[in-house]
Regions:
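Juxtamembrane intracellular "pre-TM" segments in multi-pass secondary transporters
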Residues: 7-16, 199-230, 423
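Helix-loop-helix hairpin linking two adjacent transmembrane segments in secondary transporters
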Residues: 150-198
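Helix-to-loop junctions at the C-terminal end of transmembrane segments
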Residues: 72-84, 277-290, 376
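Cytoplasmic helix-loop-helix junction between adjacent transmembrane helices
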Residues: 115-154
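Cytoplasmic membrane-interface "Motif A"-like loop-to-helix N-cap segments
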Residues: 82-92, 286-300
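Helix-breaking motifs and short loop linkers at transmembrane-helix boundaries and internal kinks
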Residues: 52, 84, 105-111, 122, ...
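Conserved MFS/SLC helix-loop-helix module at the cytosolic interface between two early adjacent transmembrane helices
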Residues: 71-110
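Extracytoplasmic gate region of multi-pass secondary transporters
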Residues: 40-42, 224-278, 368-373
Length: 423
């Protein structure tokens, strides 16, 4: 008896127009979350005047936001596995908008800190919410590149914070500026609810809900791919976040005495360099998945070299440009950690697995941001160019520890494929 021909998927199920519309909605959500995330970094000089805080206290703003972000990743991953990206992304953006509204009205350190914590909690849904639905809408060969496009596309949000937000702060002041950011985030939440769908089939709950949280978490944490991905992301993300989220604007304006326009231009270039480096990284990950680890190590080495050169030339605009290039080169390979863990994790656990990996970069960023702030205070708090050289140079210790840890975790990789298999 002749076997029936396999059922063909409709062409619009994957890689079709509807898939790209959904991707656009998710990209908009991440873009506006990134704008809110980085808006405080460009506002540090204004925060100085508004709250009158030390460098270490200012760093607590970002450290607190990132701590909430990192702590929320695994719970958000569990929510994504049970309720899907559309609901979680929309709710996350609403929380981000409320945080920005609270920050606009804040006049004390504790109130502003609580507002930034709200931003961190909502922001925690954005990137992994998009990455979670990509395999449902696109073919496997396209997912690594689209993960990178999501990552670099979110940098448009950093450009928004580097230019319009700075202009608003100059022209309208603190409260109006952050109210405008909140309004933009709420508009993005509406667009996300309209455009994003979890699955081509229209299933409301895209994965099974029968597995217990304990079992799901245990399986993810026992998977060696999770920890390889975690180390990759931790090493890649923190130089970029130190510049974009906290100390980049202060370094250029106070340590180098560059103008607001030049500083904003440099910060926007960080996002553009990430685009330039991220797209090739996504192509490499998709075409040569067995070379992902080597690609990451090469990017880290190039990044360290550019930072050394940049700090040697400081203070100058060229120094800032070179350091920003180095941060972008490292950051572009962070998404390869998601590619690895997604390939070796059961689909019903993708949310919690991706969330776990995503904590890596933000744990390392918390440590690095606070380390820079503490060193600046120990050197007198004047924030001269020399102070920033010493503070940024100390981040080399973090890089060294993380790279050695990655090499140790990777020692038991499968000899043929170069990627760990799930235990």
């Amino acid at each position: 008896m002749k076997k029936p021909a396999p059922t063909q998927q409709p062409t619009n199920q994957k890689d079709g127009l509807k898939a790209w519309i959904v991707f656009l909605g998710g990209g908009l959500a991440y873009c506006m979350a990134m704008c809110a995330r980085t808006s405080f970094g460009v506002a540090v000089p204004w925060a100085d005047q508004r709250f009158g805080l030390s460098s270490a206290q200012l760093a607590v703003f970002i450290m607190g936001q990132l701590a909430v972000y990192a702590a929320a990743q695994i719970p958000v991953g569990l929510l994504l596995d049970r309720y899907g990206s559309r609901k979680v992304l929309t709710c996350g953006l609403i929380i981000v908008g409320l945080g920005q509204l609270a920050l606009a009205q804040a006049h004390t350190f504790p109130t502003a800190l609580a507002a930034r914590a709200l931003v961190g909690a909502g922001d925690a849904t954005a990137f992994i919410g998009v990455v979670r639905f990509l395999p449902a809408w696109f073919s496997a060969s396209r997912v690594p590149l689209l993960t990178q496009i999501t990552n670099v596309g979110g940098q448009i949000g950093q450009v928004i914070s580097a230019f319009p937000v700075v202009w608003w702060l100059h022209d309208y002041g603190w409260s109006t500026s952050f109210n405008l950011v909140a309004l933009a985030v709420f508009m993005a939440a509406v667009a996300t609810a309209v455009l994003v769908r979890d699955d081509p089939s229209g299933t409301k709950t895209p994965v099974a809900q029968t597995e217990s949280v304990r079992r799901s978490m245990g399986a993810v944490l026992r998977n060696r791919a999770t920890w390889v991905g975690w180390m990759i992301h931790a090493t890649a993300a923190f130089p970029f976040n130190v510049i974009a989220l906290m100390w980049g604007s202060a370094w250029m304006r106070q340590g180098m005495h560059l103008s607001d326009t030049v500083s904003a231009t440099m910060l926007s270039l960080e996002g553009l360099f990430l685009v330039a480096a991220g797209i090739p990284a996504g192509i490499i990950s998709g075409r040569w998945p067995r070379r992902r680890l080597q690609t990451c190590l090469a990017a880290y080495a190039i990044s360290v070299l550019t930072w050394v050169v940049g700090l040697a030339l400081s203070p100058s605009a060229a120094a800032a440009l070179i350091a920003i290039i180095g941060a972008a080169i490292a950051s572009c390979v962070g998404a390869l950690g998601f590619d690895i863990v997604r390939e070796y994790t059961q689909r019903s656990r993708w949310g919690v697995a991706i969330g776990t990996v995503n904590t890596g970069g933000f744990v390392s960023s918390i440590i690095a941001v606070e380390l820079v702030g503490l060193i600046l205070d120990l050197r007198g708090g004047a924030r001269t160019g020399g102070d920033f050289i010493v503070a940024f140079g100390a981040m080399g210790v973090i890089i060294a520890v993380l790279v050695v840890s990655l090499l140790i975790v990777s020692r038991r990789l499968h000899p043929q494929v170069g990627i760990p298999q799930e235990s």
